[in-house]
């Protein structure tokens, strides 16, 4: 089984860290391939970045479908950019890290908080929660003003900031689990879970395991209505 993890931004450093973490959690024999577009924003930190990145993400999926299709796709950005569009392009399972993590939290806790990056993404995070049908379980959204690459620039300081925000979510907001709201936070879930005493869900790990399960069960993306292949038309 091969899962293609696509980091929609153009940061190869982030792609490498995502690939390493993903390979550690999947079953023996599952291969993680990880790529990022060569063009587009270096990081995705808002709607404008996401709009630019989505086009190049779709190009990567189209190339993979032509040249070397995987068994499943994972979109490794917590905004789940282009998720529905990619589901239209392929029959294979496509998993967004946000949808996977939000749903995963429901199996281990009655409530969850998302600890993410910048205040500007709050509206989009609420929309992701609504789309997942999880609004009634959301305790809070914590946005401690961390950039996507904060953990690559000053890991210790970023981790302390993340830990404090998650601690507040548990102690003050009633969160019984924490969803890490950025692929750049990969690799810290277990440490935080041990310190906080609640499940902390890494979205990349969750998405890869969900994708793996979908392939193992033989499930494909339905083409009944919503995710039908795009109709043929002229593109200028």
Curated annotation (Swiss-Prot):
Thermal profile of function: Optimum temperature is 55 degrees Celsius.
Site feature (Seems to be responsible for recognition and proton retrieval of D-isomers) residues: 77
Keywords, in A-Z order: Amino-acid biosynthesis, Coiled coil, Isomerase
pH dependence: Optimum pH is 8.5.
Record-annotated site: Seems to be responsible for L-isomers recognition and racemization: 182
Listed EC numbers: 5.1.99.5
The UniProt record lists the keyword Cytoplasm: no
Reaction catalyzed: a D-5-monosubstituted hydantoin = a L-5-monosubstituted hydantoin; D-5-benzylhydantoin = L-5-benzylhydantoin
Domain of life of the source: Bacteria
Gene3D superfamilies according to UniProt: 3.40.50.12500
Transmembrane segments: none
Enzyme class: isomerase
Keyword Coiled coil listed: yes
GO annotation, biological process: amino acid biosynthetic process
Activation and inhibition: Completely inhibited by HgCl(2) and iodoacetamide. Stimulated by dithiothreitol.
MF terms in GO: amino-acid racemase activity; hydantoin racemase activity
Function: Involved in the asymmetric conversion of racemic 5-substituted hydantoins to the corresponding L-amino acids. Catalyzes the racemization via enolization of D- and L-5-monosubstituted hydantoins. It shows preference for hydantoins with arylalkyl side chains such as 5-benzylhydantoin (BH) and, to a lesser extent, 5-(3-indolylmethylene)hydantoin (IMH).
Family recorded in the similarity comment: Belongs to the HyuE racemase family.
Self-association and partners: Homohexamer, homoheptamer or homooctamer.
Full protein name: Hydantoin racemase
Organism (species): Paenarthrobacter aurescens (Arthrobacter aurescens)
Gene coding for it: hyuA
